[in-house]
Design a protein with these regions (language model features):
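Glycosyltransferase catalytic domains, chiefly GT-A lineage
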Residues: 1-300
Length: 300
């Protein structure tokens, strides 16, 4: 069970039964987290963002959260019992810990966000999305909600002929490869579901086949039993590119951009900020606004 800490006003997070959460294990993604938090507040969300940190998160990171009154909660660093090699993409080692929100039973609803996201439109409606009650223990047909992953035979391709509906409806959970993207997950925490997840992590014959860590596990454990969200809630920046899924992308409809791949916007230096991708310019505009406001408040 995760424990509240004094690194920031945990009472703010504890006072809410519905929260946004984001995983942070080091300071590499800290600029993203700070700007994500700012963007949620900017669009008027009624719910706090709680930073879920592991033992590796350093003191300077905690200080940054404290200075901005961002609640924080310690979680264990999850890994499968048998080592899974992700040396070609080491970020997947951290991704197992994105399963921790299922354990946070002190909350009624958790919406897990990746720290490399930026919210442009209020999406508090996700806190009211119909999901199975935790009393069903993962045996229902709406265990959690997420968007689809985007391999070459992605489910989003099935929506190209009707881009208008793609703004409000997700492709069926079984469409394409039936694999979710773990960047945004809507969860009703449940001890029973979390125990199912932990049991799979102890099963090498299963985890050895999970190329995408947490999202592979959830897709395998709950095949077709999750609610597919429209892309606007987890709009991978690459979807906007010509030849990917530009047929359905609508700038004015997107609620949350996910800055997958490298470099991240905050990694751009020396006058290159936002030069490589239009969506990166969007991030820098909001980030610079955050920095200006923090400067006025004496936060450096």
């Amino acid at each position: 069970m995760a424990e509240a800490t004094a690194t920031s006003p945990a009472a703010e997070g504890a006072a809410h039964k519905n929260v946004w959460t984001t995983l942070i294990t080091n300071c590499d993604y800290l600029p993203g987290l700070l700007t994500l938090d700012y963007s949620l507040k900017k669009v008027g969300s009624r719910y706090p963002l709680v930073a879920l940190y592991t033992d590796s998160f350093p003191p300077e990171g905690h200080a940054a959260l404290q200075a901005r009154n961002i609640p924080a909660k310690h979680i264990p660093y999850l890994l499968p019992a048998a080592h899974k090699d992700y040396s070609n993409d080491t970020r997947f080692y951290d991704c197992w810990s994105k399963l921790a929100p299922f354990s946070l039973v002190e909350y009624d609803r958790v919406v897990q966000l990746d720290s490399d996201m930026l919210v442009f439109r209020n999406m508090d409606e996700l806190m009211e999305l119909e999901l199975d009650s935790s009393a069903l223990k993962g045996e229902g047909s709406r265990v959690f909600a997420a968007s689809h992953a985007t391999p070459s035979n992605c489910a989003l391709t099935t929506q190209h002929a009707d881009p208008a509906s793609a703004q409000t409806q997700g492709a069926p959970a079984t469409a394409g490869l039936g694999v979710l993207n773990g960047g945004l997950q809507v969860v009703n925490p449940s001890t029973a579901i979390y125990e199912k997840i932990l049991a799979v992590l102890q099963t090498p014959s299963a985890t050895s086949n999970y190329a995408f860590a947490d999202q592979s596990l959830l897709s395998d454990l709950f095949p077709g039993l999750w609610v597919p969200l429209p892309y606007v809630y987890n709009a991978l920046k690459t979807l906007r590119w010509e030849g990917v899924h530009s047929e359905i992308w609508r700038d004015e409809e997107v609620k949350n951009v996910h800055y997958i791949l490298s470099p991240k916007p905050w990694d751009e230096k020396g006058g290159e900020e936002g030069q490589g991708d239009e969506t990166h310019r969007w991030w820098w505009k909001v980030n610079n606004e955050r920095l200006e406001e923090e400067k006025k408040r004496g936060i450096i």
